Amino acid sequence: MKSLILDIPQLKKFADDKRHQETLWSDGHARISLICMKPGQEIVTHTHHGSHIWMVMEGRGNFLTGGKAQVIEVGQVVVVPALEDHGIQNLSAENLVIASITAGGD
């Protein structure tokens, strides 16, 4: 496998009806995805066996876990351990872009 540089601003894509999520790279052990959300879109709270690292690249949103919401914004990184409930809402008036690294599990 060769090294790869991902240009996040060039890879952003949005959909009107729901969030746009696209896998940018995967090697069977880990993957990098780009999550693009217009205002009002969300990822419903859920769990799975893999861990996430979410890096907020643009905008701000509400990170949901344990029945609570916490504002996240550009420059912040969210670490979600495997089997922890998590979701995100874009309740702002601007687009939200998150680079997601997932390792282990599904």
PLM regions: where:
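Conserved short histidine dyad/triad with adjacent acidic residue
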Residues: D17-K18, S33-T47
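Short, conserved beta-strand element in jelly-roll/cupin
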Residues: C36-K38, H48-F63
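A short hydrophobic beta-strand segment most commonly corresponding to one strand
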Residues: E94-D106
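Short acidic-glycine-tyrosine-enriched beta hairpin
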Residues: G67-A82
